[in-house]
């Protein structure tokens, strides 16, 4: 199979993965309207092509906090990444490190913090949810800091899990889910051997380390549902801000008022995100939400954006809308599932090449030269 884009990697991942895993990463909440609009709204932004702009030697690098990145891309936290390739978090972290960008380890990863640290050293980021079990949160933060993590991505848009119809149909949840997953694995022998058998253990590494017992896939949804805390407010986060000595990014901002409150709270950055359309269906796409948020807090903190990014062209569009950099989740998981570490590295090369073409043809030699003027009709999404 010829692989030339994220879309090709998606097709390859669909062939290789059992349906319950493919649809878990591919799907969204409810009827998936926001999932679709994340992509369609972003791709609807027309790039403004210019000619004879004397663009040579396009520079894709950026400095985020104290870290120099070769690309304005961060691999987003994705739960259960280790189910998509053998020890998948380690493979993705290797690829990101080799390409000079951060990998963000999910708190509900298969590989624990220590395993990733042993593989790539420090420099990766760590993501944490708001949970009722404050002991787990404190333990995870301490382990992350001891492993060299200096950037915390704190997810704030998941006080309660979103309803995902696809999961019930695919076998991730719903009636006879365990039996359905077993039968699917049986009909996907490559995954069953390479990941299902050779990729063990398949527990939630960070949670199991803390509880000193395995939290397996069957317990994943139940454990999360029992530990999400919908009652939390800004004041409840203060202990985390005081406890964490590194940079802190709040992930899941969709409203300018929340962005302003993040500044007042003392966040170093935000991720404009609707959780990839996986939480509340019917909310704004990131492409539509980003301009107003950037206008409100652009000079106060670092702005990242995710949800709907499938190419280097989309990266340029997000930056033109006001982001400093982007996070990608589904895209890298497709590549990881299809071709492991090499697939993720290749995907990042594709993104970089697409960015170079887009920047050259829009007259931008550096990322700072990508502005709203790089788009046509940018007022269309302003609120």
UniProtKB/Swiss-Prot annotation:
GO terms for biological process: aerobic respiration; lactate metabolic process. FMN binds at residues 106, 127, 155, 251, 306-330. Its EC number is 1.1.-.-. PROSITE patterns: FMN_HYDROXY_ACID_DH_1, FMN_HYDROXY_ACID_DH_2. The keyword Repressor does not apply. Substrate binds at residues 24, 129, 164, 278. The keyword Cell inner membrane applies. It catalyses: (S)-lactate + A = pyruvate + AH2. It is a peripheral membrane protein. Keywords: Cell inner membrane, Cell membrane, Flavoprotein, FMN, Membrane, Oxidoreductase. Belongs to the FMN-dependent alpha-hydroxy acid dehydrogenase family. HAMAP family: L_lact_dehydr. This is L-lactate dehydrogenase. It comes from Bartonella tribocorum (strain CIP 105476 / IBS 506). The gene is lldD.
